[in-house]
Amino acid sequence: WEARDLALSEKLNVLQKQIDESAGTSKSYTVPTDGSAMTPAQLYAACVDSVVAITGTVTSNSVYGTTTGTSSGSGFILTEDGYIVTNCHVVEDADSLTVTTHDGTEYEAKLMGKDSTNDVAVLKVEATGLPAATLGSSHDLSIGDMVAAIGNPLGKLSATQTIGYVSGINREVSTSSGATTISMIQTDAAINPGNSGGPLFNMYG
């Protein structure tokens, strides 16, 4: 844990230096080390590096010729060696995929597996030392808990954070086919097209 806290502190120090240089502020967003809840600003500083933007290229052939379009969504870094989690519907029709990390680095991504029933997909990029997100359990949430969604709404507003509360838990939602229901978290944090696949954080990160 000490090594992990040190590595996280070093990343936050680099981020703070960039903020100071660009905005001329000395305000600190140091993450609490005593296990207490973070403020929204502290949470953003601690977690935004683990969130990625995903762009897919979709090619269609018809009697009128070949057309190319794009799809966009969000995701989060699962492991330091480049595994990324997103929603299946973000990537399933794409011919090629690009993952963009918070520092602007672009990686070609491969689809490693998908579960269309539960709308989950796993991608892989060739990288090491990536800042992985910390996974939690939805069973630990309570209605009224503050949460934050970080993602790429509308495919253009990368690294956007919105704040809200857990409005409901264990909401049964039917899939588009109607054959399966998925237990969902209900929140009033603003979520738009392009947020799909992105993480929902509690105030402990």
Residue positions per predicted region:
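Serine-dependent protease modules
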Residues: 1-204
